[in-house]
């Protein structure tokens, strides 16, 4: 499938970051769906792309990492709040990352009011954001409306380790090409290039990301607990232990 892929560019910057930078400087737009098995480095790649974008816009590396973290969202409403502020001030956001987007942007929820609003915004999103990245274990988790507009499809796979033991990964990038076959317009993905990178973030960046994700996951668990409580009013758990003795479990 990737046999005819072009060789990786020789410069130091990630290919996707370069595309988003070019879009930001020319009032263009880039969107990408990053997928791969859990733990392969999807979020790491997305954050490294965002960091490079901000660094190339003139920010120092540490500040660029901060902005990259602040550009990553777990929930749609948080991103929409920022987008609204930028739109009101006639400014364009360089990049937004929707991490684990399949959780809320899944194809089975396309009819929800929140999703319908997002689809409407996505039609004009290029006026607000230069680059949008979605991460998900599988692109099939995401609603077709968004998938068909994902002009870059990026598959993340592990690729060994560096001498110091740091895991490496490769981002295989496919570009969506519009073709006309027998009078019909079709979209066809063509493998274009690769980005090689290490699956490692600065310690403080990783810790901050983990902390933000923890807050989001705890909120998800609370919401799920509320749903289950509303469906089942009984106070008697089927598993009375509930692994409450954490020390015994993790010894």
UniProtKB/Swiss-Prot annotation:
Keywords: ATP-binding, Nucleotide-binding. Residues 230-251 are annotated as: Disordered. The keyword Plastid does not apply. One of its GO terms (molecular function) is ATP binding. ATP binds at residues 36-43. Transmembrane segments: none annotated. It comes from the Viruses. Signal peptide: none annotated. Coiled coil: none annotated. InterPro entries: P-loop_NTPase. This protein may be involved in virus assembly. Essential for virus function. This is Uncharacterized protein B-251. It comes from Sulfolobus spindle-shape virus 1 (SSV1).
């Amino acid at each position: 499938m990737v046999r005819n892929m072009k060789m990786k560019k020789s410069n130091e910057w990630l290919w996707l970051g370069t595309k988003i930078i070019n879009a930001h400087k020319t009032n263009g737009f880039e969107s990408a769906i990053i997928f791969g098995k859990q733990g392969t480095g999807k979020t790491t790649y997305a954050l490294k792309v965002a960091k490079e974008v901000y660094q190339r816009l003139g920010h120092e590396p540490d500040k660029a990492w901060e902005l990259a973290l602040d550009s990553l969202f777990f929930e749609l409403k948080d991103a929409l709040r920022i987008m609204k502020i930028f739109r009101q001030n006639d400014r364009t956001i360089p990049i937004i990352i929707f991490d684990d987007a399949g959780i809320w942007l899944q194809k089975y929820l396309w009819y929800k009011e929140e999703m319908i609003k997002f689809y409407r915004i996505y039609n004009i999103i290029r006026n607000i954001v230069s680059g949008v990245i979605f991460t998900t274990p599988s692109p099939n988790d995401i609603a077709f409306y968004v998938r068909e507009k994902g002009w870059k499809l990026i598959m993340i796979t592990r690729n060994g380790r560096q001498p110091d033991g740091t895991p490496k990964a490769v981002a295989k990038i496919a570009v969506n090409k519009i073709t006309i076959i027998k009078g019909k317009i079709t979209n066809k993905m063509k493998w274009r290039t690769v980005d090689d990178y290490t699956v490692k973030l600065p310690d403080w960046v990783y810790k901050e990301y983990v902390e933000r994700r923890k807050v989001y996951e705890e909120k998800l668990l609370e919401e799920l607990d509320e749903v289950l409580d509303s469906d089942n009013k009984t106070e008697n758990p089927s598993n009375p232990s509930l692994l409450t003795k954490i020390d015994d479990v993790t010894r």
